[in-house]
């Protein structure tokens, strides 16, 4: 779960990261009132996307009236397809230098990684291109974590100014607490700023929380803003489905994350010869492919206007293919007139022959059965491009 800046800063404050919270405003009036309290402010769009400044979503306001004007312009704008419904009114800071700092999960190497740079305030990818030596990558042993000695190593490696060493060490330790104690997969500060008087402060923040650890953090539910979530992802979550919306036109249903990921790949490959068709989603129904689960999955996918065809790819294991086939037939009966797009079904594994027989006898006009994964992907891409 990605957090907005103001939410990330709340976690920073909780763990003693130096930060000023500011005031969240939903209307121009609220923005003006906040600026009257804070003085010179920065009006910052709150969306889960980068590039807010380039998009015109971050503006300096020297008066409350100017804050109101900026809020009027920013509220309702779209940044990378996301509508801005709130702004953060943050006190303007006198910045002397800007640094970059992050902890993240390095999945490829099965470890944590710290990235730090004394050239912050801009996209770290750009710094890595123009001055790679300024971007330091420090691996973190998951067993050892970050203690004071490791924090000092990080600060020294990143070449933070000597005058800021002690503050930087304490800030690194505090950010590590955010990362570990909140079960985050990313904690990023850009910029971590040196203010007048050699004071360090996190002026912006980005945090991604591991949704698999939600059971340990009931308090994280307060970060969920339902009206800002993708409606299809919200509907899938309510039904207990593992769904991620993508930008293609072939809906994907499979049992098992590995199989679904492979299905995305073969559909993308097949789509290259069918007008650039791509997968529309990731949807893993797991092992319980009964009629209701299939109906729930199909209902979510068919609710995506971009979907032109659906590829159901199932390998029967614990859940036999005849159960899956009965689930598909039952799902189509449940959906009735809501089922309007062609389905390509590929069954393999336990009781696959019986599953195919059930679907053949049902003879639903929307269903096409294909024996191979590549063939089914090609057919689904063809139908989506028809």
UniProtKB/Swiss-Prot annotation:
Binds 1 Mg(2+) ion per subunit. Mg(2+) binds at residues 190, 204. Its cofactor is Mg(2+). GO terms for molecular function: ATP binding; magnesium ion binding; succinate-CoA ligase (ADP-forming) activity; succinate-CoA ligase (GDP-forming) activity. Substrate binds at residues 255, 317-319. Keywords: ATP-binding, Ligase, Magnesium, Metal-binding, Nucleotide-binding, Tricarboxylic acid cycle. GO terms for biological process: succinyl-CoA metabolic process; tricarboxylic acid cycle. It catalyses: succinate + ATP + CoA = succinyl-CoA + ADP + phosphate; GTP + succinate + CoA = succinyl-CoA + GDP + phosphate. Residues 9-235 form the ATP-grasp domain. GO terms for cellular component: cytosol; succinate-CoA ligase complex. It is an enzyme of class 6 (ligase). Gene3D superfamilies: ATP-grasp fold, A domain, ATP-grasp fold, B domain, Succinyl-CoA synthetase domains. Its EC number is 6.2.1.5. ATP binds at residues 44, 51-53, 93, 98. Pathway: Carbohydrate metabolism; tricarboxylic acid cycle; succinate from succinyl-CoA (ligase route): step 1/1. Succinyl-CoA synthetase functions in the citric acid cycle (TCA), coupling the hydrolysis of succinyl-CoA to the synthesis of either ATP or GTP and thus represents the only step of substrate-level phosphorylation in the TCA. The beta subunit provides nucleotide specificity of the enzyme and binds the substrate succinate, while the binding sites for coenzyme A and phosphate are found in the alpha subunit. Belongs to the succinate/malate CoA ligase beta subunit family. Heterotetramer of two alpha and two beta subunits. PANTHER family: SUCCINATE--COA LIGASE [GDP-FORMING] SUBUNIT BETA, MITOCHONDRIAL, SUCCINYL-COA SYNTHETASE BETA CHAIN. This is Succinate--CoA ligase [ADP-forming] subunit beta. It comes from Nocardioides sp. (strain ATCC BAA-499 / JS614).
């Amino acid at each position: 779960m990605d957090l907005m800046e103001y939410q990330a800063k709340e976690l920073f404050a909780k763990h003693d990261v130096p930060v000023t919270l500011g005031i969240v405003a939903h209307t121009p009036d609220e923005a003006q009132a906040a600026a009257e309290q804070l003085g010179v402010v920065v009006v910052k769009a709150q969306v889960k996307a980068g590039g807010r400044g380039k998009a015109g979503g971050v503006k300096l306001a020297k008066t409350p009236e100017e804050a109101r004007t900026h809020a009027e312009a920013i509220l309702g704008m779209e940044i990378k397809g996301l509508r801005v419904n709130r702004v953060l009114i943050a006190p303007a800071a006198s910045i002397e230098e800007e640094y970059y700092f992050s902890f993240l999960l390095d999945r490829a190497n099965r470890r944590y990684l710290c990235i730090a740079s004394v050239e912050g305030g801009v996209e770290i990818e750009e710094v890595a291109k123009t001055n790679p030596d300024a971007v330091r990558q420090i691996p973190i042993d998951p067993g050892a974590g970050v203690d004071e000695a490791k924090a000092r190593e990080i600060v020294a490696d990143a070449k933070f100014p000597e005058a800021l060493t002690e503050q930087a060490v304490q800030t690194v330790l505090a950010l590590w607490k955010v990362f570990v104690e909140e079960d985050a997969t990313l904690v990023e500060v850009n910029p971590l700023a040196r203010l007048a008087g050699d004071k360090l402060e996190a002026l912006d923040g980005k945090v991604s929380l591991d949704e698999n650890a939600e059971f340990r953090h009931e308090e994280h539910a307060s970060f969920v803003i339902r009206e800002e979530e993708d409606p299809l992802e919200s509907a899938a979550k309510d039904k207990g489905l593992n769904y991620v919306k993508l930008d293609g036109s072939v809906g994907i249903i499979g049992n098992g994350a590995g199989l679904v990921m492979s299905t995305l790949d073969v559909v993308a490959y097949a789509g290259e010869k069918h007008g650039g068709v791509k997968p529309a989603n990731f949807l893993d129904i797991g092992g319980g492919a009964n009629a209701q689960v299939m109906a729930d999955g199909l209902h979510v996918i068919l609710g995506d206007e971009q979907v032109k065809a659906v590829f159901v790819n199932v390998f029967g294991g614990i859940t036999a293919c005849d159960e899956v086939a009965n689930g598909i037939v039952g799902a189509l009966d449940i959906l009735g007139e809501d089922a309007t797009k062609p389905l390509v079904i590929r069954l393999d594994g336990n009781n696959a022959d019986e599953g195919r027989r059930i679907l053949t006898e049902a003879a639903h006009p929307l269903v096409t059965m294909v024996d191979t994964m590549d063939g089914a992907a090609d057919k689904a891409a063809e139908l989506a491009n028809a």
